[in-house]
Amino acid sequence: MTIRDNHGVKVSGLAIMGGTFDPIHNGHLRTAVEILDRFHYSALKLIPCFQPVHKGRPSVLPQQRFEMAELAISSDDRLCVDSREMDREGPSYSIDTLRDLRSEVGPDESLIMVLGMDSFLSLPTWYKWQEIMDYAHLLVVSRPGWEPDLISELSGFCENYRAASPHELQCAPSGRVWFETLTPLGISSSMIRELARKKESIAYLLPEPVQKYIEQHQLYR
């Protein structure tokens, strides 16, 4: 996957964003498009998990979460929804997904996993978390003006893998960490679920086709 940026320079890289997407909302989508616009990666895959390892069971069926994600990205052909974790069923481990993707894109393609800061801070609790860097880079979306205290494991991890510039994520297939501040949107899936439960408006928090899908299927009631 190789394209040219606005200056004619070839840029490659496949970015991925995992999550429960219960439901997908404008915060997820804004993160995705800002990353694509800012770094000019070839594409970004949204990968809904079947069963999150560190959270409770999602509120709606896996197929419904997948369908909402597809509706949400239908107007941007740089985005796609990947069903591999849904197809696998059972707990969704990122390391398994990254191994699959690496085998598909080959050993030389840059693979970038996008994480929110909360997910990054919980990284040492993930299954085989230290092997992630063998397969991908991490692009961590940080909060404006917030410098979290890193536990010793993560502090050492950042010392070993932190990139000097985001360009390093495009020059190697894996093994670097970059922190990037994006536009903060105070939207969460739990907020939307609570509004829907109380039969209050969820307009403008998520794409209109997703809003209509939720209302049509009476989800989160």
UniProtKB/Swiss-Prot annotation:
Q: Which GO terms describe its biological process?
A: NAD biosynthetic process
> The organism sits in which domain of life?
Bacteria
Q: Which Gene Ontology MF annotations are present?
A: ATP binding; nicotinate-nucleotide adenylyltransferase activity
Write out the catalysed reaction.
nicotinate beta-D-ribonucleotide + ATP + H(+) = deamido-NAD(+) + diphosphate
User: What pathway is it annotated to?
Assistant: Cofactor biosynthesis; NAD(+) biosynthesis; deamido-NAD(+) from nicotinate D-ribonucleotide: step 1/1
Q: Name one Pfam family in it.
A: CTP_transf_like
Q: What class of enzyme is it?
A: transferase
Asked if the keyword DNA repair belongs to this entry, the reply reads no
> InterPro entries in the record, alphabetically?
Cyt_trans-like, NadD/NMNAT, Rossmann-like_a/b/a_fold
**Disulfide cross-links:** none
Q: What is its EC number?
A: 2.7.7.18
Print the keywords alphabetically.
ATP-binding, NAD, Nucleotide-binding, Nucleotidyltransferase, Pyridine nucleotide biosynthesis, Transferase
Checking NCBIfam families in the record gives:
cyt_tran_rel, nicotinate (nicotinamide) nucleotide adenylyltransferase, PRK00071.1-1, PRK00071.1-3
Q: What does this protein do?
A: Catalyzes the reversible adenylation of nicotinate mononucleotide (NaMN) to nicotinic acid adenine dinucleotide (NaAD).
Q: Which HAMAP family match?
A: NaMN_adenylyltr (MF_00244)
Protein family according to the UniProt entry: Belongs to the NadD family.
Could you tell me what this protein is called?
A: Probable nicotinate-nucleotide adenylyltransferase
Q: Which organism is it from?
A: Marinomonas sp. (strain MWYL1)
